[in-house]
Amino acid sequence: MITEVKRDLVALLKEAVGDIPITYDFLGENTAKGLVVTNLNMNIESNLSGDLDFDTVTADIMIISPYVNEVDQLADALLRDAPYGVGWIMGLQFTGASFTGDPTTGLHVCTLNISCEVNANGPGD
């Protein structure tokens, strides 16, 4: 299920960023080309009662780029009209964002906090 959620997140990010060059770096390999999406940490809270057919997934996505405008543009696209923006439409709710800048490396970091519900029974159920 984690792989499916990662795939869905990649699709969502691609839709949000449009033409911005972006690299999805879920393995932690470093790259300075375009935006880097890394540190996708997920916590799955299963619905133990069985009343509902989905689990709640929370994720923190760290976006790193030497270009602060790209980071701002991406965050704006993802958080636009929250909770009814692009994320909400695809079942993901962006619940917050934080920004930091590293004067030593010149990299700008946006960490997005995400909450989403995924089908606990797998695709097609």
Predicted regions and their residues:
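Contiguous hydrophobic segments
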Residues: 3-10, 58, 120-125
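Ser/Thr- (and often Asn-) enriched beta-sheet segments in non-cytosolic proteins
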Residues: 21-23, 41, 53, 58, ...
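Short, surface-exposed loop and linker segments with low hydrophobicity and enrichment for Pro/Ser/Thr
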Residues: 31, 48-55, 101-108
